[in-house]
Regions:
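Short, helix-capping/interhelical loops that line the mouth of catalytic, cofactor-
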Residues: 2-9, 60-115, 120-123
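Amphipathic, well-ordered alpha-helical segments in soluble domains
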Residues: 20-23, 50, 54, 115, ...
Length: 161
């Protein structure tokens, strides 16, 4: 049975990169002040490092192990509009990767935030020129939306108290 006193995941909606960064900065401040609880398993530092890693992949290239097999790509491309506009579902794993994803290093929240901020500023300035390994070619707006939906998913597990 679930703990009724455990923090509940928050539903977030970011319209801009600046909105997402403002929320991350608020969470880092709450964490520093000892006012941050988790609805999920990841610390804030791990969460921000993970978000930074995936934003950096879009800009610098994806490792082979995160490329989806063809049948999965076909399904995900059919779901692209729904994911980009409505959000991501918690609990999805990337293939057979340990931990279900990559970018899971534990880092101080300030370090994760600095990396993510740098990557998001690059993304804001120009669109990635590579294909996304799951969704294929994306417009600049779609790349931004994808990163915002990813941030909503993970930052929703960080609960200021």
């Amino acid at each position: 049975m679930a703990d009724p006193d455990a923090p509940r995941r928050r539903t977030l909606r970011f319209e801009t990169i600046d909105d997402a960064l403002a929320e991350a900065e608020r969470l880092v401040a709450a964490d520093r002040e000892g006012r941050l609880a988790r609805a999920g398993n990841w610390s804030l530092g791990k969460t921000l490092g993970h978000l930074a890693t995936w934003t950096e992949f879009a800009l610098n290239g994806y490792p082979r192990e995160v490329h989806a097999p063809l049948p999965v790509r076909v399904i995900l491309r059919m779901m692209r509009g729904r994911i980009l506009n409505k959000g991501m579902v918690p609990g999805v794993k990337v293939g057979r990767l340990p931990g279900g994803t990559v970018g899971l290093d534990e880092v101080p929240p300030e370090v994760g935030l600095a990396r993510w901020r740098t990557a998001l500023h690059r993304l804001k300035a120009s669109a990635p020129t590579i294909d996304n390994p799951a969704f294929g070619r994306l417009t600049h707006e779609e790349w931004v939306k994808l990163n915002l939906r990813h941030a909503e998913l993970h930052l929703g597990n960080q609960v200021p108290t």
